[in-house]
Regions:
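N-terminal loops that bind phosphate or other acidic moieties
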Residues: 2-352
């Protein structure tokens, strides 16, 4: 699916189904709105999927994997070889997201869109666009053509999920250095100084953190990415994993597939997707608010409320995995609980 085809296929989520799902919640024999954000999540799923009868199975978490040339600048504790190692663990079902997803009844699909390793990793879907990005202090991270190609690889994964019968998606990422690229992207899209949106990632020292902020600030100064053109921003200071996630969200919206975000990095890509095609927002669900400094900022920019505030910042799609059991519980209440009429009790009324 080309990016233009995906964007053209996106339709706004059904407002009629939103109203019907809200009405169903109001009929359930419990205090109005008492399941909080979980009620809104079920409403969003009904509207996005086009069905009042909410179905949450089967489901899969797609993890976009790619390496970032910016690691050369000392912005991480580990080398980029770790990306392929963790992706391989995902393929074997041994990574953190895999163990959590197994408990949540979800498949995990790791996708190589830009790992630096030359050899294919067994069990990892190969959609490689390039062998990592460039160091954005030396050159733009990607060409615009590479960025679009990665976005289209992401959109194709959404189509594949839909064709395989999945009704709910989750999103994750793996790429050493991608808290740097996502912070750079958010600095551009939110028009904020890098220091405000940059955290310590996987545990940088104060000196390392200061270096990270300096690198982002310098990369933005050199390339002047446009906050009005997310593809330009992705190309100049982003990453292949971020671009693929951006396309994945656009593809999910095009397919009518609700998709759960993880944390900061998936949120940055989601913001890029929404800036490209605003209707994508209606297909997104926030899982948790990341402990990274910009975690709350990106959700505010998206207008999404997370159900979980647990100080998480692991990545991989673990936040999406954590939300799924909560959605199951909420869907059970939505679907099976008696109505006020059925138990012969006067319904609650909304206070004006």
């Amino acid at each position: 699916m080309t990016l233009k085809e995906a964007m053209k296929s996106i339709k706004p989520a059904s407002q009629a189904l939103r109203r019907q799902a809200k009405r169903r919640w109001d009929q359930v024999a419990k205090p109005l709105g008492s399941l909080g954000v979980l009620e809104e999540d079920i409403i969003r799923i009904a509207a996005a999927s086009g069905s009042l009868a909410v179905s949450l199975h089967p489901r899969a978490i797609v993890v976009m994997c790619g390496d970032n040339g910016i690691v050369k600048e000392g912005v991480t504790q580990t080398g980029q070889e770790v990306t392929a190692i963790v992706a391989g663990n995902m393929a074997q079902g041994n990574s953190c997201v895999c163990l959590m997803a197994r408990q949540a009844g979800a498949d995990v699909i790791p996708v190589d869109v830009g790992m630096a390793c030359c050899d294919a990793v067994p069990g990892v879907v190969n959609r490689k666009v390039a062998y990592g990005t460039k160091d954005f202090l030396e050159a733009p991270a990607m060409t615009r053509e590479e960025t679009v190609k990665a976005m289209e690889a992401g959109a194709d994964m959404a189509v594949e999920l839909k064709e395989r019968g999945y009704v709910l998606a989750g999103s994750g990422e793996m790429g050493i250095g991608n808290t740097t690229t996502s912070s750079a992207l958010l600095s551009v899209l939110l028009d904020m100084d890098p220091e405000r949106v940059t955290g310590r990632g996987a545990g940088l020292t104060t000196a390392g953190y200061n270096r990270k902020v300096q690198v982002i600030r310098e990369g933005i100064r050199i390339h002047r990415p446009s906050g009005e053109d997310p593809v330009d921003a992705l190309s100049k200071v982003g990453g292949l994993d971020l671009a693929a996630l951006t396309g994945f969200y656009i593809g999910c919206a095009a397919c009518g597939l609700p998709v759960v975000l993880d944390g900061l990095i998936t949120g940055a890509a989601a913001l890029a997707a929404v800036r490209i095609s605003p209707d994508v927002k209606e297909y997104l669900l926030a899982s948790h608010v990341s402990a990274e400094p910009a975690g709350a900022m990106v959700l505010d920019a998206l207008g999404l409320k997370p159900a979980i505030s647990a100080g998480m910042c692991l990545g991989e799609g673990t936040g999406a995995a954590a939300l799924l059991p909560l959605l199951d519980m909420a869907a059970s209440v939505y679907t099976r609980m008696s109505s006020f009429d059925e138990i012969h009790v006067d319904a609650y009324e909304h206070l004006v």
